[in-house]
């Protein structure tokens, strides 16, 4: 789960954030302003300061916020001087916008506010529809307006060119005041309340926000055009209300509620994608007539309210179709305010103690939750005041025997982390500042100060010598329990030598100087152990899931606050050193104990082990259905100690018992099958791979299937002596189900003579779930999920269904993925009723898949497999190719045809795409790389002996918004890298690839190709983009660059090779067609070419998604001459960019003299 933050405001107007990965409230970086309330999202936070002005806080990111400004220069031809700036009176402006109606000279295009800055000066855009224009960027037409072309013709009477300039938002990690260009007479009054939401309104543009505000006079205002690329918005719009509004709340979707002065609630109706401001108001009566609604907060499908008597209420029956709900339900607890965040999680501030509470037990099936639980988190600034010299020594007894007082003992081995409630006001022990003069005369043996607080700290933390029980706590409060502390290699001996003066008495060289032991300042409003008093909380940007709760609700009660701070300051990197040391010692000990006994004969030379079970088997012949069978896996160990296995499948045909057997040393893949109703998997052998007809088995439960998969996979790996993590040279691939497979390449795989056939490659599954993967021969592997989340390989193996012996015990983490399932609603037009769901007998199903051949209804459509679970309702998908109208419909003349978003006279059919999100949770050797979502990633392919192996590894990526990024700091020891470097582009990109010689190729979303010049290890981002013409009448969608070869794939499945690439001209000269029927291409460090073919016909069946290897690829024949077909049937992605294993030279190659280099030979790096 990615890290997110909870925002809060204390009674002094200071803004704090609490990370889901941390345990301390951190003060906002820009703390100059005092705020009354805030409303947060994942990317930014809006707030109302004490001056009643609105501010926005945009979080910093490696990807800048850029906005493109455009202006068009228009010219007309005349017989005297050719094209010139003199236009006809009826023509458009000489400098205009794209429509020609608005006058837009370059010198009058200004920045919208002081929070923006220009990236560069104006320049001409020489890209026209994915094709480069001639120098100057002019496009020609017969008149204004008309269809423009990049070629000048005899009847081209007008021309225009586009000038562009980018501006960048610079006010990040600071509170930026929202400017207003409105008429001063119509400016809104000072604001009293504000709410941000609407980011999940059905298929709104990514980053779109709805910002609502309430003025002191009770008026409701809406901020126009707020989005990721325009975080400030443009202007305020006033909305009429039936009364004076006090407070307002906007949910992530289409819910908007407000409270009136009279205590009633207002509900905004009619909010949708085309009308985010809604259309009308409805009034909802409060729960009781005596106490009206004082505060309200809404989520996706919930409404929580607080009445004037501080009672908390939950609104039942709220959804998009019924935003008013049905009735009120009183909840336990008294709150001053509540806030609904992500996933309908609820936060609140207690009425009496002013603490932040979290509503536990909120799930999609129980939206009201179960109980309130206080967040036990101190402020980050308290860490600098909670330490003292005595706290150092009291901490020493928990970290070893380096520091010993006069009455110390080791902690009890029954320590455990306990979950306690936050102490009440009477239980708080404010720490007293230590006096320097008293500390100077303290006991040097024990290191204790003279203060009473320090004595209590040591006595509570370190029990007496020989005693296993701590001294009873003389202060009221919960009984302290010992806490389990992590090991550390920090040396505390240095603290013995330092007298217990004040914090300034500790030298900076001490290993604990990072604690910042400073005396308490008089400016702090709280004591050391006092909890802050909160006034407002906002969870709109905080993601909390029931399966992964933050560490906000537990404290180590057996420790004083200073020792607790110390234990939390130890990083995982510090605790990893002793773990590695112990592991190395155990490994060496095992080797010493085993080496001396290897010459002894085994007591049992042969052993047989059998596992049986009941499964179902897909019968290969009539009646072609699932048949109940008995399985028996027989494992035996030969004289040579090698274990082998045979799988027997016993079935009955016409009351006759038969069986088939499979030697597991012949199995090349065990693949889980995408099935909505059965837990099934397939077994492939070389023969079955050529036939495209695997052995398919199904288990009764998911656990049974996982057990058999893990056991069979382990047996196959033992037969082939494959174990542990994949080698750095491994070939990675992904199936359409998202399963990850790796294959160890044989040296003969890329041999020019007699290469290893692809159908004999052994594929084993790795835990996790990805959409694509990219590997490097130095062991760096990245992946991208269906939800565009980036993941990095941790070096483990197994996970998912592979547990126990088939999985590593470390480097396995929880992984989740989200994808959308799409169905189509089809309608036909008739003269009487217009478009209806009644079609012709020859038409497709009125609810179908994209092809129209399979019926798919909302009720009958299930998640892709039983491992997935729905996480949303059905919604209209407006992002389909071709565009849609405001209701999501696409029109065409008939089924099937080319669809477009606007209706014409010849359109007799239409369709609408519906989508629903589903989620999968699994585990694997993958760690998330936050926080930028990626669309594509490429790692430089390297051979082990390359000169650049000492440099950091070059990694380029494309974000889901189309930004090009370069990852810095990637290495074998730090495969995740350190930060992103943004590389500017004039349009969003879709695919990117970096070759072995740092040649970077990319494809834009409009299908055009680009080459990045001057990319070196010392200049990782290069200097400029070169526009490369695409193949004639083709739009590219993917590119892959090897050592000297560059291949590209277009939208029609055609594979193209870039000719003419030389060291002096790395852009090449032209595209040459290689093959069709290709879905994905990967070019390796040896210029080897592997693809995923769309359809491959086998001897028994047709398979979609097949791994194919280009044969005959040589330096003088880089395109090769044929295809070798490997594993297939549902493969989506392959990466061979880590395979730098060269084939051994044959005797004939060694005897032949080396041929002289030709002009079209390989490029020297």
Curated annotation (Swiss-Prot):
<feature type="repeat" description="TECPR 6">
    <location>
        <begin position="953"/>
        <end position="984"/>
    </location>
</feature>
<dbReference type="GO" id="GO:0031410">
    <property type="term" value="C:cytoplasmic vesicle"/>
</dbReference>
<dbReference type="GO" id="GO:0016236">
    <property type="term" value="P:macroautophagy"/>
</dbReference>
<feature type="repeat" description="TECPR 4">
    <location>
        <begin position="344"/>
        <end position="376"/>
    </location>
</feature>
<dbReference type="GO" id="GO:1901096">
    <property type="term" value="P:regulation of autophagosome maturation"/>
</dbReference>
<dbReference type="InterPro" id="IPR006624">
    <property type="entry name" value="Beta-propeller_rpt_TECPR"/>
</dbReference>
<dbReference type="Pfam" id="PF06398">
    <property type="entry name" value="Pex24p"/>
</dbReference>
<comment type="similarity">
    <text>Belongs to the TECPR1 family.</text>
</comment>
<feature type="modified residue" description="Phosphoserine">
    <location>
        <position position="388"/>
    </location>
</feature>
<keyword id="KW-0968">Cytoplasmic vesicle</keyword>
<dbReference type="GO" id="GO:0000421">
    <property type="term" value="C:autophagosome membrane"/>
</dbReference>
<feature type="region of interest" description="Disordered">
    <location>
        <begin position="404"/>
        <end position="486"/>
    </location>
</feature>
<feature type="repeat" description="TECPR 8">
    <location>
        <begin position="1044"/>
        <end position="1075"/>
    </location>
</feature>
<keyword id="KW-0458">Lysosome</keyword>
<feature type="repeat" description="TECPR 7">
    <location>
        <begin position="998"/>
        <end position="1029"/>
    </location>
</feature>
<dbReference type="Pfam" id="PF19193">
    <property type="entry name" value="Tectonin"/>
</dbReference>
<feature type="modified residue" description="Phosphoserine">
    <location>
        <position position="938"/>
    </location>
</feature>
<dbReference type="InterPro" id="IPR051513">
    <property type="entry name" value="Tectonin_beta-propeller"/>
</dbReference>
<feature type="repeat" description="TECPR 3">
    <location>
        <begin position="301"/>
        <end position="332"/>
    </location>
</feature>
<protein>
    <recommendedName>
        <fullName>Tectonin beta-propeller repeat-containing protein 1</fullName>
    </recommendedName>
</protein>
<keyword id="KW-0472">Membrane</keyword>
<comment type="subunit">
    <text>Interacts with ATG5; the interaction is direct. Interacts with WIPI2. Interacts with the ATG5-ATG12 conjugate, the interaction is however mutually exclusive with ATG16, since it does not interact with ATG12-ATG5-ATG16 complex.</text>
</comment>
<feature type="modified residue" description="Phosphoserine">
    <location>
        <position position="412"/>
    </location>
</feature>
<feature type="modified residue" description="Phosphoserine">
    <location>
        <position position="386"/>
    </location>
</feature>
<keyword id="KW-0677">Repeat</keyword>
<dbReference type="GO" id="GO:0005654">
    <property type="term" value="C:nucleoplasm"/>
</dbReference>
<dbReference type="InterPro" id="IPR011993">
    <property type="entry name" value="PH-like_dom_sf"/>
</dbReference>
<dbReference type="GO" id="GO:0006914">
    <property type="term" value="P:autophagy"/>
</dbReference>
<feature type="repeat" description="TECPR 5">
    <location>
        <begin position="729"/>
        <end position="756"/>
    </location>
</feature>
<feature type="modified residue" description="Phosphoserine">
    <location>
        <position position="417"/>
    </location>
</feature>
<dbReference type="InterPro" id="IPR006614">
    <property type="entry name" value="Peroxin/Ferlin"/>
</dbReference>
<feature type="repeat" description="TECPR 1">
    <location>
        <begin position="209"/>
        <end position="240"/>
    </location>
</feature>
<keyword id="KW-0446">Lipid-binding</keyword>
<dbReference type="GO" id="GO:0043231">
    <property type="term" value="C:intracellular membrane-bounded organelle"/>
</dbReference>
<feature type="domain" description="PH">
    <location>
        <begin position="611"/>
        <end position="717"/>
    </location>
</feature>
<feature type="repeat" description="TECPR 2">
    <location>
        <begin position="254"/>
        <end position="285"/>
    </location>
</feature>
<feature type="modified residue" description="Phosphoserine">
    <location>
        <position position="391"/>
    </location>
</feature>
<dbReference type="InterPro" id="IPR010482">
    <property type="entry name" value="TECPR1-like_DysF"/>
</dbReference>
<keyword id="KW-0597">Phosphoprotein</keyword>
<dbReference type="GO" id="GO:0005765">
    <property type="term" value="C:lysosomal membrane"/>
</dbReference>
<comment type="function">
    <text>Tethering factor involved in autophagy. Involved in autophagosome maturation by promoting the autophagosome fusion with lysosomes: acts by associating with both the ATG5-ATG12 conjugate and phosphatidylinositol-3-phosphate (PtdIns(3)P) present at the surface of autophagosomes. Also involved in selective autophagy against bacterial pathogens, by being required for phagophore/preautophagosomal structure biogenesis and maturation.</text>
</comment>
<dbReference type="GO" id="GO:0097352">
    <property type="term" value="P:autophagosome maturation"/>
</dbReference>
């Amino acid at each position: 789960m990615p890290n997110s933050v909870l925002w809060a405001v204390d009674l002094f107007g200071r803004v704090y954030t609490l990370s889901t990965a941390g345990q301390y409230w951190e003060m906002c970086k820009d703390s100059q302003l005092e705020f009354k309330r805030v409303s947060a999202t994942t990317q930014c936070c809006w707030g109302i300061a004490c001056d009643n002005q609105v501010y926005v806080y945009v979080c910093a990111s490696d990807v800048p916020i850029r906005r493109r400004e455009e202006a068009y220069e228009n010219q007309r031809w005349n017989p005297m001087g050719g094209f010139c700036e003199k236009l006809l009176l009826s023509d458009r402006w000489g400098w205009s916008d794209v429509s020609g109606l608005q006058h837009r000279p370059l010198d009058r295009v200004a920045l919208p506010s002081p929070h923006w800055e220009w990236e560069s000066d104006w320049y001409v855009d020489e890209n026209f529809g994915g094709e480069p224009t001639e120098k100057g960027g002019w496009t020609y037409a017969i008149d204004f307006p008309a269809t423009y072309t990049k070629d000048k013709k005899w009847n081209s009477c007008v021309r225009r060119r586009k000038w562009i300039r980018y501006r960048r938002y610079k006010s990040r990690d600071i509170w930026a005041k929202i400017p207003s260009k409105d008429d001063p007479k119509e400016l809104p009054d000072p604001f009293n309340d504000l709410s941000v939401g609407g980011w999940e309104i059905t298929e709104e543009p990514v980053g779109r926000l709805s910002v609502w505000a309430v003025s002191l006079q009770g008026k409701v205002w809406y901020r126009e055009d707020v989005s990721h690329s325009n975080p400030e918005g443009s202007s305020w719009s006033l909305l009429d209300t039936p009364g004076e509004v006090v407070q307002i709340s906007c949910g992530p979707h289409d819910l908007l509620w407000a409270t009136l002065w009279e205590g009633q609630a207002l509900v905004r109706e009619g909010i949708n994608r085309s009308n985010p401001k809604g259309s009308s108001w409805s009034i909802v009566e409060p729960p009781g007539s005596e106490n009206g609604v004082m505060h309200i907060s809404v989520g996706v499908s919930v409404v929580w309210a607080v009445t004037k008597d501080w009672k908390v209420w939950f609104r039942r029956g709220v959804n998009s179709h019924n935003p008013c709900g049905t009735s009120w339900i009183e909840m336990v607890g008294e709150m001053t305010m509540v806030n609904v965040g992500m996933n309908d999680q609820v936060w609140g501030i207690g009425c009496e103690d002013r603490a932040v509470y979290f509503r536990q037990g909120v799930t999609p099936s129980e939206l009201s939750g179960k109980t309130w639980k206080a967040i036990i988190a101190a402020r980050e600034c308290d860490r600098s005041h909670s330490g003292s010299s005595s706290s150092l020594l009291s901490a020493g007894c928990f970290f070893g025997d380096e520091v010993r007082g006069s009455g110390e003992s080791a902690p009890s081995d029954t320590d455990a982390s306990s979950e306690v409630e936050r102490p009440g006001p009477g239980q708080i022990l404010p720490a007293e500042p230590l006096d320097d003069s008293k500390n100077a005369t303290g006991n040097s043996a024990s290191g204790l100060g003279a203060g009473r607080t320090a004595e209590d700290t040591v006595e509570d933390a370190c029990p007496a010598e020989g005693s296993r029980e701590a001294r009873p706590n003389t202060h009221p409060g919960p009984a302290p329990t010992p806490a389990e502390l992590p090991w550390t290699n920090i040396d505390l001996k240095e603290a013995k030598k330092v007298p217990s003066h004040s914090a300034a008495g500790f030298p900076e060289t001490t290993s604990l100087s990072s604690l910042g032991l400073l005396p308490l300042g008089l400016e702090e409003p709280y004591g050391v152990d006092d909890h802050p008093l909160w006034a407002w909380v906002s969870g709109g940007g905080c993601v909390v899931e029931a399966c992964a709760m933050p560490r906000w609700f537990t404290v180590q009660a057996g420790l004083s606050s200073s020792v607790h701070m110390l234990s939390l300051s130890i990083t995982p990197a510090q605790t990893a050193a002793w773990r590695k040391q112990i592991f190395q010692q155990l490994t060496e000990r095992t080797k010493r104990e085993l080496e001396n006994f290897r010459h002894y004969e085994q007591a049992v030379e042969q052993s047989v082990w059998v596992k049986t079970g009941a499964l179902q088997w897909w019968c290969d012949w009539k009646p072609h259905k699932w048949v109940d069978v008995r399985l028996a896996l027989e494992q035996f160990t030969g004289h040579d100690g090698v274990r082998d296995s045979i799988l027997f499948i016993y079935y009955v045909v016409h009351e006759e018992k038969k069986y088939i057997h499979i030697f597991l040393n012949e199995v090349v893949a065990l693949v889980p099958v995408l099935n909505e109703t059965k837990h099934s998997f397939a077994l492939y052998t070389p023969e079955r791979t050529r036939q495209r007809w695997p052995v398919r088995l199904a288990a009764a439960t998911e656990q049974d299937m996982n057990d058999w998969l893990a056991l069979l996979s382990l047996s196959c790996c033992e037969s082939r002596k494959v174990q542990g993590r994949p080698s750095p040279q491994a070939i990675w691939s992904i199936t359409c189900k998202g399963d990850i497979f790796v294959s160890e390449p044989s040296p003969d795989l890329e041999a020019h003579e007699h290469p290893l056939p692809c159908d004999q490659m052994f594929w084993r599954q790795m835990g996790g779930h990805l959409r694509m993967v990219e590997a490097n021969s130095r062991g760096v592997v990245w992946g991208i999920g269906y939800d565009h989340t980036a993941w990095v390989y941790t070096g483990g193996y197994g996970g998912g269904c592979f547990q126990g012996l088939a999985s590593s015990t470390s480097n396995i983490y929880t992984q989740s993925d989200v994808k959308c399932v799409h169905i189509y609603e089809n309608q036909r037009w008739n003269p009487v009723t217009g478009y209806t769901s009644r079609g012709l007998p020859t038409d497709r199903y009125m609810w179908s898949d994209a092809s129209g051949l399979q019926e798919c209804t909302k009720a009958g459509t299930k998640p892709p497999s039983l491992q997935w679970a729905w996480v949303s309702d059905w919604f209209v998908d407006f992002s389909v190719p071709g565009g849609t109208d405001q209701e999501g419909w696409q029109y065409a003349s008939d089924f099937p045809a080319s669809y477009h978003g606007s209706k014409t006279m010849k359109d007799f059919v239409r369709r609408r795409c519906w989508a629903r999100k589903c989620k999968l949770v699994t585990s694997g050797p993958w760690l998330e790389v936050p926080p930028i979502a990626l669309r594509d990633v490429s790692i430089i392919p390297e051979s082990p002996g390359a000169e650049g192996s000492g440099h950091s590894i070059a990694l380029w990526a494309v974000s889901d918004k189309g930004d090009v990024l370069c990852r810095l700091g990637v290495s074998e020891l730090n495969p995740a890298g350190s930060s992103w470097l943004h590389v500017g582009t004039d349009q969003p990109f879709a695919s990117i690839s970096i070759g072995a010689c740092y040649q970077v190729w990319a494809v834009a979303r409009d299908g055009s190709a680009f080459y990045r010049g001057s990319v070196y290890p010392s200049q990782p981002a290069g200097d400029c983009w070169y526009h490369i013409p695409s193949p004639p009448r083709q739009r590219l969608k993917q590119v892959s660059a090897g050592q000297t070869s560059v291949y590209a794939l277009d939208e029609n499945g055609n594979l193209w090779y870039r000719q003419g690439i030389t060291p002096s001209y790395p852009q090449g000269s032209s595209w040459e067609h290689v093959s069709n029927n290709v879905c994905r291409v990967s070019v390796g460090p040896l210029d080897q070419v592997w693809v995923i073919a769309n359809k491959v016909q086998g001897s028994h069946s047709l398979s979609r998604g097949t791994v194919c290897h280009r044969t005959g690829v040589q330096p003088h024949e880089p395109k090769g001459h044929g295809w070798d077909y490997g594993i297939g049937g549902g493969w989506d992605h392959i990466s061979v960019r880590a395979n730098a294993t060269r084939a051994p030279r044959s005797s004939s190659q060694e005897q032949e003299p080396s041929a002289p280099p030709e002009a079209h030979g390989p490029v020297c790096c």
